[in-house]
């Protein structure tokens, strides 16, 4: 838990504080809403057609630190993955900007922690309402920078906004305890207090929702944040900063430092090793998560991490084929297969295998349409970059070379270098890359199995365990398998399981902690035991 000390000004607006441990000078008027200068027109000239006509206030290109929009010494380009067109040039923050953002967040924390839960709740609710009022523009930003189909982008904005709504309500439900001790003259109190400044590092596949799921909980708890968005999708984070400012979130409470891939490593290390940071929250690859854990270890920071997955999708003989296919379509091809909870391997019992594969292939051909995310009817957009396409292509070629059969798809799409055909493979075996390497693309490999025990063994062989799915009509089997799968989340006869009300997270090397739900706010709170004697 952070203790606040006086820091020399880093140029950020400071907040007053009544917290006795914080020796920052109070400001007249109390909390100071973030200022909102207009964006520089020179930075906006490069936007492609997907962003044309959007509110200039939402199309930000500078960092947002201490309530101010600040340029960096350099900029980096952000591209539309569908067309390759330049969307704009964004501030390329470095270590200096990262440290300034942490200082701004630390100074703001000393007052934000003292704001009443009711007021924090009200501000988060205003932020939520502004997201809803601007949902169409926010969705277009997501589609432009990530390639996600516009319909899915609209869904993400609602999902993202709902986290702010949820945590605006949870802010008022942070309760402590009173414990009666064996000694009659004592009472024991358990207090919950905000942990401090949180470093928040988010991925490109859900550039809005992965921010609000973390930041909503942090701000509700009384923490402040420094957000480092993915270099592919910084515009969503910056648009959220503008709306946070409009909502009256005080200066320094929400800070955003975009940076290029070249600077990402040093910026991430700077914010994660800074002694003023008390918490790290990260969503991304297991490899990067392990690096951040090393950074956290030196100063024993609190961490929560949602890392890679290898989600099994099991279809037992008793399953309803149509339901299983519908679930497979939803769990595999959302965001073109680029989610951490996408089904990565399909385990189908021998008795139902042929019927499932046939129906799955038919559903893919009938319902999946590859195209630009802005085109009506598109269900499968581009992958985020050509490196992602190469990974899918490598897995397909490896599987075919080892005996797998391509049922449909199997190659790059004619639309462009970042597009790949939705692909279904059968005759897949466990020695193939696609069964033990997270795909993050539109590839569905099917493994035939004989017994329940065999399916469980295959599913649990992975060293990660984020999500798992299975279809069965046998009640006893449902209980057995749900309890035996080594994952943090299980979908039983359901392919879409994410909800703001439910805890999201994994086991094994899929991460630490939970996000969303009533448990999410606890990731940003410390327990303090107070023994009150002499009664």
Swiss-Prot record:
The modification N6-succinyllysine is found at residues 126, 135, 184, 265, 402. The record marks 205 as: Transition state stabilizer. NAD(+) binds at residues 213, 228-231, 284-289. Keywords: Acetylation, Disulfide bond, Mitochondrion, NAD, Oxidoreductase, Phosphoprotein, Transit peptide. Residues 1-47 form a transit peptide. InterPro entries: Ald_DH/histidinol_DH, Ald_DH_C, Ald_DH_CS_CYS, Ald_DH_CS_GLU, Ald_DH_N, Aldehyde_DH_dom, Aldehyde_DH_Superfamily, Succ_semiAld_DH. Redox-regulated. Inhibited under oxydizing conditions. Transmembrane segments: none annotated. GO terms for cellular component: mitochondrion. It is an enzyme of class 1 (oxidoreductase). Signal peptide: none annotated. GO terms for molecular function: identical protein binding; succinate-semialdehyde dehydrogenase (NAD+) activity. Pathway: Amino-acid degradation; 4-aminobutanoate degradation. The keyword Ribonucleoprotein does not apply. Homotetramer. Catalyzes one step in the degradation of the inhibitory neurotransmitter gamma-aminobutyric acid (GABA). This is Succinate-semialdehyde dehydrogenase, mitochondrial. The gene is ALDH5A1.
């Amino acid at each position: 838990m952070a203790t606040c000390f006086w820091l020399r000004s880093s140029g950020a607006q400071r907040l007053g504080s009544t917290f006795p441990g914080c020796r920052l000078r109070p400001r007249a008027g109390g909390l100071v809403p973030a200022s909102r200068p207009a964006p520089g027109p020179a930075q906006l000239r490069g936007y492609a057609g997907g962003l044309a006509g959007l509110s200039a206030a939402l199309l930000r290109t500078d960092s947002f630190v201490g309530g101010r929009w600040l340029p960096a010494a350099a900029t980096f380009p952000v591209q539309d993955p569908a067309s390759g067109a330049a969307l704009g040039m964004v501030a390329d923050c470095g270590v200096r900007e990262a440290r300034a953002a942490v200082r701004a967040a630390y100074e703001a924390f000393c007052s934000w922690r003292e704001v009443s839960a009711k007021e924090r709740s009200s501000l988060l609710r205003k932020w939520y309402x502004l997201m809803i009022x601007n949902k169409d523009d926010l969705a277009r930003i997501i589609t432009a920078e990530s390639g996600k189909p516009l319909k899915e982008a609209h869904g993400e904005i609602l999902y993202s906004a709902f986290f702010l709504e949820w945590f605006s309500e949870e802010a008022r439900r942070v309760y402590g305890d009173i414990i009666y001790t064996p000694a009659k003259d004592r009472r024991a109190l358990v207090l919950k207090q905000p942990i401090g400044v949180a470093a928040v590092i988010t991925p490109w596949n859900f550039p809005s929702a992965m921010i609000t799921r973390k930041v909503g909980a942090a701000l509700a708890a009384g923490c402040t944040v420094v957000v480092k968005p993915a270099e592919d999708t910084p515009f969503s984070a910056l648009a959220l900063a503008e709306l946070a400012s409009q909502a009256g979130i005080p200066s320094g409470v929400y800070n955003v430092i975009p940076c290029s891939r070249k600077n990402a490593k040093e910026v991430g290390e700077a914010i994660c090793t800074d002694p003023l940071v008390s918490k790290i929250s990260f969503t991304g690859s297991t490899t990067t998560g392990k690096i951040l854990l090393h950074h956290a270890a030196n100063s024993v920071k609190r961490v929560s991490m949602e890392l890679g997955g290898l989600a099994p999708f099991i279809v037992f003989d008793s399953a309803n084929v149509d339901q299983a296919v519908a679930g497979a379509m939803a769990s595999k091809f959302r965001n073109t297969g680029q989610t951490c909870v996408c089904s990565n391997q399909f385990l189908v019992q021998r008795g139902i295998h042929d019927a499932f594969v046939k129906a799955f292939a038919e559903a893919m051909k009938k319902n999946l349409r590859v195209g630009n995310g802005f085109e009506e009817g598109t269900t499968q957009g581009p992958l985020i970059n050509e490196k992602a396409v190469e990974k899918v292509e490598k897995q397909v070629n490896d599987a075919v070379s080892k005996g797998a059969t391509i049922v449909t798809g199997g190659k790059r799409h004619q639309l462009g270098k970042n597009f790949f055909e939705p692909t279904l493979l059968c005759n897949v075996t466990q020695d193939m890359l696609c069964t033990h390497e997270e795909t993050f693309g539109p590839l569905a490999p099917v493994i035939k199995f004989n017994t329940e025990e065999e399916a469980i063994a295959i599913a649990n062989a992975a060293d990660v365990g984020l999500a798992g799915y299975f279809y069965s009509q046998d009640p006893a089997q449902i209980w057995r398998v749900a309890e035996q799968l080594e994952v943090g989340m299980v979908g039983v006869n359901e392919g879409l399981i994410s909800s703001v009300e439910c805890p999201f997270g994994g086991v094994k090397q899929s991460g630490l902690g939970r996000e969303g739900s009533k448990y999410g706010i606890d990731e940003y709170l410390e327990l303090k035991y107070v023994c009150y004697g002499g009664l």
